[in-house]
Amino acid sequence: MRNDEWTYALKANTNLVGTLAHSLEWTLDSVDQSLITVVEGIESAGELSPSARMRDRLREVVRFESVVRLHALGNVVVINAQGDVILDSGSQEPRKANVADRDYFLAFKERGHEGLFVGRPVPSRITGVMSLPLARGFRTPQGEFGGIVLGAVRLSYFNGLFASVDLGENSGVNLFRNDGVIVSRF
């Protein structure tokens, strides 16, 4: 390969990586902002109950956050300290699921994680769709672990994003978490 061809290919790939990174960052940040808004609503209410008022507030937040316009996001759910779904943005009555054994739940309950936690890709216990879970914990008014707010990005979103780019022959994209866990491979 000639030097000018190599330089062009390098520049094109750098631009491609930058565009993909920006799109991924925007998506994950949008989901996180939705989770933050729900956590703040729960903590400011001073209670966690599956009341109609709380359910309506959850739907309102999810509906008006920009992330709902994305086909990437599944439902946002609120999970109590025992790991049970108690509020569900996608259903009047929360669908039954327990996530007490999942890494994103244990990070908050057992290890006191602060901030956003990106879980291992897993099939949703509610829909069965392979997803990347994103969670934020919340506290009770007494400062104890109250549960988590969970959103999930469908793995098909990543594959669709990567497929929309002409990667060229024998090329691929891998997306990893900070600890090396593969999120998506295309």
What kind of region is each of these model predictions?
Residues 1-50, 68-74:
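Juxtamembrane extracytoplasmic/periplasmic/luminal helical "stalk" adjacent to the first N-terminal
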Residues 47-48, 88-91, 186:
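Short acidic, glycine/proline-rich loop/turn micro-motifs
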Residues 48-55, 140-143:
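Short, glycine- and charge-enriched coil/turn segments that flank and shape catalytic ligand pockets
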